[in-house]
Amino acid sequence: MVEKTSKPSAKTEVAPPVKIIELGAAVSVKELADSLETNPVEVIKALMRKGIMANINQVIDFDIAKGVIEAAGFEAKLKILKKSAAKKASPAKEKLSNFPLRPPVVTIMGHVDHGKTRLLDAIRSTNVMEKEVGGITQHIGAYQVEIKGHKITFLDTPGHEAFTAMRARGAQATDITILVVAADDGVMPQTLEALDHAKAAGVPIILAINKMDKPEANPDRVKQQLAEVGLVVEEWGGDTLAIPTSARENKGINELLEAVLLIAELEDLRADPNQPASGVVIEAEMDKTKGPMATVLVQSGTLKLGDTVVAGNTWGRVKAMFNDVGKRIKKAEPSTPVALLGMESVPQVGDKIIAVATEKQARDMVNENSQSTRKTNAVSLTNVYDQVSQGNIKELNIILKTDVQGSLEPIKDSLEKLSTDKIKININRSGAGNVTESDVMLAMASGGLIIGFSTGIETNAQRLADAEDIDIRHYDIIYKLIEDVDKALQGLLEPTIKEVIDGRAEVRAVFESTKKLSIAGCMVLEGKLVKNSQVRLLRGGEVIVDAPSNSLRRFKEDVKEVVAGYECGVGLKDFNEFQKSDILEFYHKEKSR
């Protein structure tokens, strides 16, 4: 960074106005470089001249940043940040202003060992309403607490996977996320995953720094680690409330709940209780004695006993409803979680549920839902140009995975520079390592795609991506990666051919046919086997042969297809060396979207 010097001039000229750069009380080196429109290396050099050693993610305070800004010839100004929750009212919110307030819906997320469950138990034990005798005892996946006369609804999801599964199906169930981080362990990879999912949901985040009772607790380290990934607490000039807690000693619980109420007040959460009920399925199961049972979060309207409801591909009449403490109730207002009985079959988590006027209307809606193919809201490189042209999207969300950490920054910077006035490139998550199931779920939830550079993909992740039609691109050359994205934004990228696995089967026995051909006696494990498909035979994880199937039989009868759970005989063209435990993958190729 070159420090500006003044030069004498023969003429008296009016000096141009000095550019003012506004910053919060704390800023990372990269953010400061972006504000100065310079390379982060130049900022690091400027800091070194002041005796400060820093890396690109280092967070520095305003006074230090001010010195760098002024040395570059600009003026620094401290920006007073407003809470992210205090958003401008949209037309929809203005219409809601006449309706009553509803309880906030909160999800607690974080690393599995950071005390998330114990924190939930502490909240529940000190604030939950007393259970009634004679109700149900099933855990319904949500509960309400009351503090200072105000209710708060907590979704007790097993992890951010369930949270994201709901969003992937178009259901936004949460108003506020509490991110739990242990004060002794600090930020862990699962913490960052949870943070990515919370950010993608676009809801306010409250930081609970838990395990403050531990001797090695270091809350400042937690704040520093989170600041490096863009989550800055209020006391450092950010907009995130940070609450120290100890679930073990029951400390900080009320302060945490008060923080939730503060955010809820700023969000001005309202709903119309008088319209037909609508909500989302947050848990569902087949109860052995009661039949299909669904836990529903009512989001608007009032769900009543006897209502006819539709949820995805099933419907029913509400025969019984139980609240979170097992009490039978006759109605449920907005933000109330209830377990209901009366569905024809078990709905899926994330299904939207709505009350309708008649049974005929319910059946018609189910038929319509069943006939339409469920698709995710994800885009692909092939169709992104059309999506932008049609006004469907204004942002391209990308999950970026590379082989090593050093490859991330140059690829991220190059991709972000491809943003135009019509579409913005967002890197929702970046990291080193294989593409995981969590990456695919984030792509599902954000309507995005995945780009891998010199890295692989986990088997479960590939299966989920195939099932949900998520575009995963693999590259070994950075130039080709950037070129493809650039072409995609201009509508110039040619469609790619991808493999779609239709079904998998395991060889359980081997038979010799009359024509001296080997037939594999198989059990179909998943999907379906289709006659004349291309088949890949795997043995110990290695591909032994890739050949078309020329025989598919059940009980000596030729069949066109065999679905999961059934046995069959399979023959492959010019192949007779089947062995027990071989895996057969039936697949076809198609152009990507």
From Swiss-Prot:
Residues 101-270 form the tr-type G domain. The gene is infB. GO terms for molecular function: GTP binding; GTPase activity; translation initiation factor activity. It comes from Dehalococcoides mccartyi (strain ATCC BAA-2100 / JCM 16839 / KCTC 5957 / BAV1). Residues 110-117 are annotated as: G1. Residues 156-159 are annotated as: G3. Belongs to the TRAFAC class translation factor GTPase superfamily. Classic translation factor GTPase family. IF-2 subfamily. InterPro entries: EF-G-like_DII, IF2_II, IF2_N, P-loop_NTPase, Small_GTP-bd, T_Tr_GTP-bd_dom, TF_IF2_bacterial-like, TIF_IF2. Keywords: Cytoplasm, GTP-binding, Initiation factor, Nucleotide-binding, Protein biosynthesis. Residues 135-139 are annotated as: G2. This is Translation initiation factor IF-2. Its main location: cytoplasm. It comes from the Bacteria. One of its GO terms (cellular component) is cytosol. GTP binds at residues 110-117, 156-160, 210-213. PANTHER family: TR-TYPE G DOMAIN-CONTAINING PROTEIN, TRANSLATION INITIATION FACTOR IF-2-RELATED. Residues 210-213 are annotated as: G4. The lineage of its organism: Bacteria, Bacillati, Chloroflexota, Dehalococcoidia, Dehalococcoidales. It is found in: Cytoplasm. Residues 246-248 are annotated as: G5. One of the essential components for the initiation of protein synthesis. Protects formylmethionyl-tRNA from spontaneous hydrolysis and promotes its binding to the 30S ribosomal subunits. Also involved in the hydrolysis of GTP during the formation of the 70S ribosomal complex.
